Structures are given as C-alpha cells and as structure tokens.
Amino acid sequence: MDDGNENNENAQHDEYDEEEIEIPIDEIIIEEVDDDHLLEGEGEFQIITQPSNNNNNSNNNNFGDIYVSNPNTPRNNNNNNNNNNNNNNNNNNNNNNNSNNSFNNNKKNEVSIGISENTNENNNKNNNNNNNNNDDYNDGADERVKTEEEIKKEAENELNQSVPFLSLFRFADNTDKVLMFLGTIAAVINGAAMPTVSLVFGLVVDAFKPTQFNDDPNYDIYDTVRSISFYLLMLGGGVFVLSYLETTLWMIAGERQTSRIRREYLESTLRQEIGWFDTNKANELSSRINSDTVLFEEAIGEKVGRFIHFFSTFVAGFVIGFTKGWQLTLVITSVSPLLAIGGFFTAKMMTQMTKLGQEAYSRAGGVAEENIGSIRTVATFSGEKLAIDKYSNNLKDARTVGYKRSFFNGLGLGFVQFVILGTYALAFWYGSTLISNKVTNSVSDRPWTGGDVVSVFFAVIIGATSIGQASPCLALFAQGRGAAYKIFQVIDRQSKANPFSTRGIKPETLSGEIEFKDVGFHYPSRPDVPIFNGFNLKIKPGQTVGLVGDSGGGKSTIISLLERFYDPCQGEILLDGEDIRKFNVRGLRQKIGLVNQEPVLFATTISENIRYGKEGATQDEIEEAAKLANAHSFISQLPQGYNTLVGEKGVQMSGGQRQRIAIARAVIKNPNILLLDESTSALDAESTKLVQEALDVLMKGRTTIVIAHNLSTIRNADVIIYIKKGVAVERGTHDELMAKQGLYFDLVEKQSHQQMYNLLENGTRSRRSSTFSAEVNPLLDSFHVSKRSLRKNESESNKKDKEDSNNKKKKKSNKKKVEEVPMSRVVKYNRPELGLWCFGFLSAVGTGAVYPGFAMVFTEMLTIFQNPDPNYLTDHANFVALMFVALAVGAGISNFFQGFLFSVIGEKLTYRLRRDCFAAIMRQDVGWFDLPENSTGKLTSHLATDAALVQGMTSQRLGIVLQNILTMVGGLVIAFYSGWQLTLVIIACFPLVVITSKVQMQILAGFSSKDGCGPAGQVASEAISGIRTVASFTTEKQVVELYKKQQKGPSSEGIKKAHISGFAFGFTQLILFCVYCLSFWYGGKLVGSGVFGATDKEISDNCTPQTIPYLWKDYDTCERAQNTIYGFNSMTRVFFAIVMSAIGVGQASSFAPDLAKAKAAAVSVFKLLDTPSKIDPTTEDGDRIDIVGGDIEFKNLHFSYPTRPDNSVFRGFTLTLQSGTTTALVGDSGGGKSTCLSLLQRFYNPVVGEIFIDGHNIKNLNVRHLRHLFGLVGQEPTLFSGTIADNIRYGKHDATQEEIEEASKLSNSHSFIIDLPNGYNTELGEKYTQLSGGQKQRIAIARAIIRNPKILLLDESTSALDADSTKLVQEALENVMKGRTTIVIAHNLLTIQNADCIAYVRAGQIIERGTHDELLEAEGPYSQLWYNQQQK
C-alpha cells in the first residue's frame, strides 16, 4: 500500500520526488510467511513478483479467476501515463523504481486472493483523470504533506504575525458601525473635555494675579472666579451625557460583535471537513470559543471607547498646548519619540507573549474537556492525578509566558511614567525661563504669564497622562489580537467539503448506484499509512452490500468516503454516475442515512435527538421512527416520555437504548442510501432481532451498505464483500462465498464455533470440515421466527427500561441574592506570594505617592509664577524642576515593580485557581457529572473564564486600585493640612461618588453572576465533539441556530449591564466636575474674604521698604497681594490634592466592571472549590486490603440515579460471587447490568444495601485502592489523545515498554501496532478516528490487562471485534481470567455459556441464576433467550 501512495504522490507532484533508486530487472523474492497468513494449498513460502520498470502489468499474475498478488502494491500501476500527462519528461521508470524500493522495505508481504474479473480493466485505467479532474470540483482533494522545515518556518511566522487591530471589527454590521461611530464621537468629545479644563484653570491663575491690584484697587477676585465656575458646571453636564454614551454604545457594540464572532467561529468550525478534525483537537477548538472570545470582547468593547477617550484627551491637550504657546509645547513634544518607541516595543512583545499564552491555555482547555468528557474512564483507571498533572503542565507553560508578559508590561508602564514626569521638569524649567526673561508669547502677542504656562502645562499634563492611562487598554488590545489570530484562522479557512455551501448538484432523489474507481486514500493525520490503493467497488441501485473482514481493513473508511468526511487522494467515487465531489455536500448527506457503531447523542430530549435526522419532523413522525427502531416502548414508559433528557453524550441511557434512538434518528431521515456500521452491536438478542426486521423493511428499495461482525445480520445481502487490507479480495452472495470455501467461509466457521471457554480446547482452526454444514445450519438457515413471540418478548424487555433512563430534571427557580467571596479569602489564596505582595504594596505606595507629591510641587511652581520678582522666580524654579526629576525617577521605578509584581501575582493566582478548580472537578463522584449544570461544556467554560477573571481582584488592576486609594488618602491629608474649610465642603460631595461606584459594582455583579454563557458553550462543545454525527445528519445549521438562541439571554443581560455601567460612570464624572466647580467657587470666596491668606510674618517679610516701591504701588496693595498669593497657594494645594484624589476615585471606578466580574467569578470558583465530594478518589482516607481474594457480595441493593430519584434501578438486588469464579450477567437492555459494575467501582453509592469485597464494605475502602482492584473493558472504549503506548500505560501508570508490548500481544493488538510507521509512538489524535472499532477495543483490552487486576469486569468487551480478533482476544481474556473473579456482561450468550454462574437480570432484580445447563433445563427467560439467539 505504501507503494501505491508513493506512486500517487509522484504522479501528482513531480517536483517533490524523493531520491530515486533504479532496479533494472524483475526480481523474484521468496520470503517465509507465518502459518496464520497461509491460504489453503500453500506451502511455507510465497512468491512475490516485483514489477519491472517497463511493464506496468507485472504486479498481477492471472491464473483464471484467481490472481496472486501483493496487497501492498497497487493493482493499477499506470504511473507512466500519469507522469507523461503531468510532466513531459522521462521520469516514469524512476517513479516506479522509487515505489519498488519502498516495497522491498516492507516487513511482510502477504498473498491475497481476489476475484480477477476487473483486473485487466483496472490495470488499463487512465489515471491522469485523477490528477486533472480534481481541480474542477468545488472542494479540494489531497494536500502535499509539509516538511519539518516548512512546519518550523510556519510556526515562526505565526509567532511574528498578529491580527491588525482594525480587523477585529470585520464582523461588525451596520448597527454596530453606527453604535461605534456614535460611541467614538462621544469618546472624542468627552476626551477633549478634560484638557479644556486647562483653559479654565489658566483663567483662574490669571484671575489671582496679584499685580492686578496695582492697576485696579477695586478688583474683585470672587466675581471673576464665580463666572469661571459656572463654565465648569456646564462642562460637567456635557461630560455626564458623553460618558454615558461612550461607555454604553461601545459595550453594546462589543457584546453584539462577540456574540456574532462566536457564532461565526462555531459555524466555521462545523463547516470544516472531518479530516481537519483529525489534526485539530476538538476539545481545544471548543475551549477557544469560551476563553479566547472573552479576550476578544475585551479588545473590542468599552476599552476601545476608553482608549479613544484617552487618545482624544492626548490630542486635545497638545492642540491646546500648541494654541496657547507653541514654544513650550514643542519642547515638551520633543520627547514624544521616546514614548512611541517604548510603546511600540511593549505592544509587540505583549502581542507575542499573549499568543503563546493563549495557545498554552487552549491546550490546557483541551485536556480538561477530554478528561471531564471521559470521566468514567478516568475514574475507572484512577487517572485523576495524571489528568491534573497534564493540565497543570500546560498551565505552567502559560504561567511562564505570563511572567514574561508581566515583565514587559511593568517595563512599559515604568518607562512611560518616567518620560512623562521628566518632561514636566523640562517644561517648568523652560516656562520659568520664558516668564523671567519676559519673552513675548507669539500667540497672544504679550509676555508670557503664569496663566499661559499653567494652561499649556496643564493641557499637556492631562494629554500626556492619558497615554499612561491608555496603557492597560493597549495590553488588552494585544491580548485580543493574539486571541483573534487563532479564531480568524478557523473562520478564514476554506473547507474541502463545506456543508453550508450552496454549490454543487442537489439531487431530488438518488437511485443509489455507487462505484469506487481506482480509489487511493490515506488519513490526513497518517499520510504514510495508505488505507486504499487502487480500490474498486461497484454497487447497483437498491442492492444491499455487506462488508466483512478484519478490523482495520478499511470497511468504515468506505462509509467515511461516501459521506464525504474525507475525499480520496486519487481515483474517484461515482454516485449515479457523477463524482460525489460534484454534489452539494449538504444535499448529498441528506440522502444518506448513517448508524454508527458508537452512537452519539446530544444533551437534549429524546425527541430532539431523533428530530436531528429530519429538521422540522412532527411528533407523529418521531414516534413512528421510534417504533420502527424498537425504541417507542421504552420511551413511552419513561415519566417524561419523549421529553426525557438523555444526559451529556446520552449517559442517562443504556447502551442499547442509545443505539435504538440513533437508529430512529436514521430511520426518520428516509434516506436513499443507508449506511449501517455495526448498527445492532449494542443490542440484546430480542432487540437485535426486532431492529433487524425494522432495518430489513427500511432497506427495501434502498442501496444499503452494512458493516457487520455478526454475519447473521448480512446473510441475505445481495452481495457480500470481504475487505482485507484495503482490497476487496472476495465478493458474492452468501451461498456463493460459502461454496468457494475461502476467507468468508472461514469467518463463518469461526463465528459459528465462537465460545469463551471452548476456545482453549479448539486451539487449531477447523477448516472446511465435513461436519461444518450440520454445525452452522442453525446460524445460517434458521433466520425466521414467530414475530408474535418476539413482540411479546420485546414488551417484556422494554417494560422495565424506564429504570435505567433519564427523568426530566426538575427546574428550580433560584432567585438568590448575589453571594460574595471575602477579599481576604482571595488574597489568602495568594499567601505564598507574601514577599511579592509586600514589594508590590510598597511599589503601589510609591506610585500612589507620586500624584500627591506632584500636587505639592506643582502648587509651589504656581506660587513662584505669581511672584513678580524675577530673581525669586529664577532661583526657586530650578529647585522645583529638580523635584520633578526626582518624582520621575521614583514613578518609573515604582510603576515598573507595581506592574510587574502584581501581574506575576495574578498569573500565580490564575494558575493556582485553575489547577485547584480542575482538581476539585476531578475529585467529584461520577454522579455529580450527571447533573445538567455540571456538563462538560459548562465546566470547561468556567475553567477557561472564571479563574482568569478572579485575577482582576489581585493582579494589575488591584495594584492600580491600591495605588489610587493611596493617591486619594495622600491627597486628602494634604488638602486638610492646606485648608480644612474648603476640604470639608468638597468632601461632602464624596459620598455621592462612593455610593455611585458601589451601586454600579453591585448591579454589575448581579448580572455577571448569572450563568449565561454555559448553555451556549455546552451546545458548541457537544457539536464539535460529536462532529461526525452533526455532519452525517446535516444539522450544522440547526446547531448554529440553537447556539444563537442560547446566546439571547447573555446578550440581553450584557446590554442591560452596558446602560447601567454607562450611567454610573457618567454620573461619577459629573460629580467630579461638580467638585471642581465647587472648589473654584468656594476657594475664590475664601481667598476674597481673607480666610485664606498670608500670616503677619509672611506679610512683614515680603512687604519691606525695599520691595514696595520696586513691586507694589503701596503697602496696602502689597498686603492684599501677599494675601492673594498665599491664599491662592492654599486654595490650589487643596484643589490639586482633591484633583489627585478624584483621579484615584475615577480610575478605581473605571475598573468597576472588571472588579464586578472578578467578584462574581470568585463566587463561582470558590463554590466549586468548596463542593464536597461524596466519593473522593484523590483522598488517602479509607482501608486497604492487604491480600485480595476476590469474594464479592451485593447485599439487598436499592438504587436510583441521582438525576432520577423516582426511578428505581435496583430493588433488593442480591448476588454473591466467589473468589476466582466467572459470573455472567445477562438480560434485557436497561435492566441494570452495567449499573452493577458502576456501583462496584463506587461511581455511585447505593441508596440502601451494601457491597462487600472479601468481607470489607467497599464504602470503608480507599477509593483509589478499590478501583485498582478492577480491570474494566467497556462496551464503547474511550481512549485519550496521545500515543498508543500512553493509552495502554493509562491502565498502569508506571508500566515499562516491555509490559506494554506484552499486554498488547495478549490483546491481539501488537501486530497491527507495529505495522504503523511510528508503532507504539503513533499519536491517536482527537477522537482517534483513524483506528477501527476493533483496534480501539483491543487497545482498551490491553489497557485493562496491563493492570493485572484482581477482579475483571467485561462489559460487552468483544462486541466490536471480528471473528478472528474475537477468538484471539477471548483466548487472551481466558488466560487473564484464570484465578480472578470475573463479571461478564454479554448479549452474545455463546461467549458466557461456560461461566461458573449466569444471572438473568430484569428490572433491577435477579430472576434466575445457575450454570448454562441448569438454566436451559429450567426453561426460563435464559432458555428462551438462548434459543432465540440460536435461531437467528
């Protein structure tokens, strides 16, 4: 098969040819072959003929109707034609030789027997169609495999690339654009309002200019200041409206776009071809829709409006500065390149670090979803610690990246603050020089005044400070751009089989003619392992075709190709004469009905699960389909009937019930083509017979492909085809194949004799014996029984199904008051970072002291400007400039350490919370996961978002809040010291600010606490994890619509939150402007009335005979001037101290939405952490049994599932198993057999009764120790992403490679594993779809065997295996079972007839028990079940 793949690659891509090796002549290789691979009449050797370079047909040596060939070489090898068509050169021989070289490297080359009726025809196929036609289809075909260097280069490019900021808004609709436009206008005007205060303040400064008393002795300061205060009040009203609009409009626009992007991402994910999911983990994809989109929303919501606001402030400040005094402004802006360089570097590094961090978090989310979704397997094999460690390792990667991001974040903040305050030093020094030298202001055409300098300086202060305030927004934008990169990659990817596309043929009906022509195929995740190479198959309309053969031979791949889950790498598949790639994908799949071996149900009602097969189906149609699938009886007996919730992945239903619902889902589709992949494997005998009858009716007139290991289900097929290693080696009717006595004949013989305990006695195969017909006649010929008796049995079987089915959950309306988690508890969780806390707190103190210090220094500078003495101005201005330099250095250092340390604290908290939350989930009992609120989607959503949001209480945001609190306190201390009267009046307004902020936080917390994203996240998670079922039943649009419906609740709450947040923020800003207004008005009054003024000493020191004639008109004027100067100093010190306090309050309140989210998330997180486990598998408590014998006793058990307390599963169940014996449980589907195993493993506790092992009550045993006693092989094996070796080692965590291989040999999996290119290191990938059902089951058996368990639990452990594998695995299990207590659940009674005890379970009670012979003699239910099976 490898040869064929290489030939195809060479034919299609000559430019990628590998080194070519010539073999000049034909070679005859004689190779020894194992006995198992010999066919009848063969000796110990096989003849393999390799083709010469010039003979394309030498692969096949025809001997009449039978040819002998190597299945690993292509039957059609016409690559010379391919190469001539693709490239006019003479590389034909080289291509063939390259294939032959690969051929020689094969470990074994087996002889296959096949029908040669189309051999010559196949050899003459014109393969250039395969290369030329594919481009004509609307969806692509195969892609070249990338080299390692290309992959590395692509990874480097991904790291360096980032989504342009504006592209974040690519999904905005017209409404969003209008909202953003209006929000931008509001933000621009609102941002420009604050620098306007600088003009007002310049007027205030000039209003207090003392030299005015020389010109006008009657000048009244109070009247001037009162007029200025009125302007501020008007400005405050405008700011209130603008702040409301800015915040509300951007929040609404962000909420709308995020909802849309989530839908687009989900739709884009669902439209991808199935092969894409083989290389992209579904759990990471679904995790991204919860975690990455949160960062995306942060980057496009109100933070954008806030950034525009700050940027507008920056621009307006500098515009005012240039207008009032371009010389001074130009000096200040000369340092702006430093800010630009620092900002660019910081943003670039933050973007890269964010992307790496999100990738690590996505991997962690994938681990969480995989393990939570497979919690029963995790619990069985005590894999909780492995899961936690794997999850933690990914979190550690994200944490390490977070540390680096924290460093660059702190560095950026510190650098910006240093440059800004350093610029102030330069500005004041230069401004004082302009005043002292009496330089003419070219704008006002008069000498520079203190008011001019203050207006320019204050405008630039506000503008420059806004850059620092915008820095957190830039960090969020960087995170959003990094998160959007992966999201947009999925959205922009063109699917090769797009179910949403309207292109292609949309057939009204199909006759069902199917033809595979020279098909070559390999799975995208395993390009080196060809499945088909030149595969040919033709099916006539209305035919029923049975596919049989070894596991892994390619049977299920045929179905996948027909469904267009994958496209062939070469060749074509024709449907009614048209290549299926020309059909519309959705239209094609709507005409095909599929029932898989492992049915996938969704966490909704039974009715909705069946309706997935036909959109808009009526209830009558649903019930009719259920009747045909033998599901109506058990459904109608459930308390909620068709409205019963099946639970996540159908966990509330038994295996047989799930399968019957899945069959009903296919039946209601009324397809033209029916694909049945082991569709009755999970059913008991009665159900199998009845469902098979229903399927027989359904198959009439339809083309049907049936994959079956149970040959009785395909005995009447029109054609039966034996598939071996991707080649159809035998075909014909049942009678024709039996007459030929070939591989199919062997398979029938093996299956007819298959028993568990006589396999050891019959170690050698009985081939073509003379007594064969007599032995298999009951299996092959007695296919019809009385329908009336079977209907009666069905009624009895289904009568009690309701005990193992789901009851609709009672919905509780919880209108609880929003809980709160004490801040101290969150901080306590960061206790290990006490040292970082101390340094971070000191840094916040330093940063918080900067602004009060600035108020003091700035006030001194204003006082200097008011003094008309130029010598005084020059001397003191230099000192004040040096004080600004000191402030700049301190601010740079404190901001760096504050930003860095608090971010590190936040990263550590996020890591610890996520790890502990996941550990808390892993320690819960299995019954806890049955609850709707604990579904996989909801839990992974909480893990992805809540822990990260809690960081808002302790990380950088908390640092900023602490900083601003200290700023406020420092400012108030200065204000009270400078003028308590004015301070008290202003402080009287503060309760309004505090109350507004508190109300905002409480209301936002109320909205945030509502679990709005959970249901939508659950829909997405289930759809992506069950993508094959979604694709097969073309329910992609339904899923998207359901997701959209689930989004309505969170979206409406988000809009409410936007209005409240906008109003609260606007009202807070209004209060601040009122404070400014009151400060100037009342301050002017205090100065004018003399309350604020100079002391007698200050007057006497400044009003001397030397200064009066030089500066003042007279002594009275000098006295008034000194009172004005010192009064102005007190007033401005109070004012700027209050301004700094107000800035602290304003910035703290701006983080109210984040803090509210953090507090709500903390409630969710700590509620999970505090949830006790009824059955904790991680605790060390409990007894341990030193020497385990294996005696088991179930004593008077009564049990009902936690989600269905009214439906009793067990009613006095009692059973005793002696050590070393085998006990088989048989009976109706849903009767409680699997529940027995669940209770034994303590997935649940019985309501009444006890279970004993060797006399020990299992409730008293350590849970982990208890589960280590068992080896479980379930009906539907669950494997994990990772290598095959990792999955087998999951049974014994410290297993060596030798132990792994030994377990694989015992489970008959070693041979197919070593045939894979990477052997035991083969990555299974997401959902391990590249393995057949039998291969998965054998790996699962190896996983159980490697534990060397004391007690073996087998739940239909061989139901998915073919006859050959079943025999070998049964032999392996027989060896393992020796000396062990074994419980076997089986529908096939042949596998348990030699059990020491057989118990018939019905409705949660054992109605009869005994050996096989004893139960047959009793002629009870077991006897009837046995004879029913023998008559099939």
From Swiss-Prot:
Region (Disordered): 1-21, 48-149, 787-819
One of the protein's GO biological processes: sorocarp development
Keyword Amino-acid biosynthesis: no
Main location: membrane
Occurrences of domain ABC transmembrane type-1 (ranges): 180-479, 837-1157
Subcellular location: Membrane
Keywords: ATP-binding, Coiled coil, Membrane, Nucleotide-binding, Repeat, Transmembrane, Transmembrane helix, Transport
Binding-site list for ATP: 549-556, 1227-1234
Gene3D superfamilies: ABC transporter type 1, transmembrane domain, P-loop containing nucleotide triphosphate hydrolases
Protein name listed in UniProt: ABC transporter B family member 3
Name of the coding gene: abcB3
